[in-house]
Amino acid sequence: MKTTIVKVWIDNEAVYIQTNKGEIFSERFANYPRLHTALPSQLADFECDNIGVRWEKLDEDLSYRGFMKKEKYLHPV
């Protein structure tokens, strides 16, 4: 089964992705200066496509592949 992203969400500290296999990965905003200093309203203004998550107004992109390459696996749902 090919891994696909079924859900993307944020909280005050990170952006999360969930795969069709139930895996959840995250990237902390603190690791990205533009995201770390952004206002909550700016963080909430993101778009998703088949490659990753983009914050157009902040000029920041995070690829899904990058989420999954790191040891950031949280837990199955």
Where does each model-flagged region fall?
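Motif-centric detector for short Cys/His coordination patterns
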Residues: M1-V77
